[in-house]
Amino acid sequence: RGNMFGYNNLIVDFRNIPDMLQITPTVVMDCTHSVQRPGGAGGKTGGDRQFVPAMALAAKAFGANGWFFEVHPDPDKGLSDAANMLPLDKLGELVEKLKD
């Protein structure tokens, strides 16, 4: 997910992926929670879903071989983590990019 350094933002250090691959064959990137802004929406968790594809592709570039996404047909109506959910209709295109 990342580390919390304040400012209601999570920071992801992709350099950790190759290190983890030295001790385990599988590294799964939590792409949607990584764009969360804990407490960043006035008392609830905010997020930046537009960065989910970039997070996934960056993780792939660093060697991740699995990806986790929270998806919803209408993310803004999601009961939890709405601000960082990937719209369901965007998932297929992203998965195809990750398969290349």
What are these regions (language model features)?
Residues 74-100:
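C-terminal helical cap(s) of enzyme catalytic domains, especially alpha/beta-barrels
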Residues 1-71:
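Catalytic alpha/beta core domains of metabolic enzymes, predominantly
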